[in-house]
Structures are given as C-alpha cells and as structure tokens.
C-alpha cells in the first residue's frame, strides 16, 4: 500500500462509525429524493419496471397508488435494507459521505450490481481515488445512456468525495 492510500485509509478510519451500524444521513436521503422524485401513481421507469413513490419497485403493479406518507415510510424502510447491503459488502471503514453515496448508488442499481462491481473491488482494496470514476460508469438503463443517470452518478461521485453535489 503506498503512502497516499495509507494516509487516506487512516483519515477515513478517524471519520467513520464502522463497528456501529451506519445510517444514511439527511444529505444522502436528499440526493435520493431529488433524483428518484416522488410519484404517487405507478409508472414504468426507463428500465421498464413498474415503479412508485421514491423509486420503489417491490410489489408494484400498473394502477397502484400511494399517499405521500406511505412513500416516505417505504423509503425509510427500504433505505434501512440498502444500508445493510452496503455495510455487508464494504469491508473497510467509510466516512458518512462515502456511505451516503454508496447507499444512494445501491438504492438505484441494486445489491447485485454492487456485489459484482469493480467499484466494490476498488473500495475493498482501499483504492478510494478510483471509486468516483467507477460510480460514473453506471449511466445506462435498458442499454441506453441517460442524461438523468449521468447527472445522478456525478452527484453520487461528488458526495462520495465530500463535495457539494447540489449544482449537478
């Protein structure tokens, strides 16, 4: 491990809560809400899946509706699940902003993509400097590059680095 990677790892160890269950922050949740949007009626997303609320696909069918209160509840429940996926997959400590970005990414792309990604391999080898570019590679739905996914991945990459993502 080179000195730069060692220092970065030490710095992140000092900023982390690894060992305690990490929770997504309001900042991470805001990123998800912004890019998912909230729709109270089921719709077909670009990946051709029935979706409702803040990107919920579980048990959704055409014609389904929900209230804003239900959408918020579902998001909180699902985020707890996705926090667990990230916690279990990443073997090194993370800062809050890194954790938030990874939960947002995994919420959008799913735990299977996380577990098979080069991004995860980079994370677990402490190659944190490679992660932002790996985040950005995932900009397609249905085989097509989408402007919305380009912006979302840019925002997640910035958040991962602890930078302001709001202007993306």
What residue ranges belong to the model's regions?
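Long, amphipathic alpha-helical surface segments
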Residues: 2-47, 54-61, 66-84, 92-93, ...
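Short, structured surface segments that line ligand/substrate-binding pockets
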Residues: 88-99
């Amino acid at each position: 491990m080179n000195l730069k990677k060692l220092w970065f790892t030490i710095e992140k160890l000092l900023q982390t809560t690894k060992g305690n269950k990490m929770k997504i922050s309001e900042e991470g949740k805001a990123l998800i809400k912004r890019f998912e949007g909230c729709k109270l009626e089921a719709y077909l997303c670009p990946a051709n899946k029935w979706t409702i609320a803040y990107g919920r696909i579980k048990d959704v069918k055409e014609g389904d509706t929900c209230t804003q209160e239900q959408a918020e509840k579902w998001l909180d429940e699902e985020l707890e699940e996705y926090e667990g996926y990230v916690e279990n997959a990443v073997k090194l400590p993370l800062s809050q902003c890194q954790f938030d970005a990874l939960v947002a990414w995994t919420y959008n792309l799913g735990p299977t993509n996380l577990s098979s990604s080069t991004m995860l391999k980079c994370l677990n080898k402490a190659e944190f400097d490679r992660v932002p570019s790996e985040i950005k590679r995932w900009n397609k739905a249905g085989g097509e590059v989408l402007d919305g996914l380009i912006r979302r991945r840019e925002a997640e990459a910035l958040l991962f680095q602890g930078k302001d993502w709001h202007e993306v």
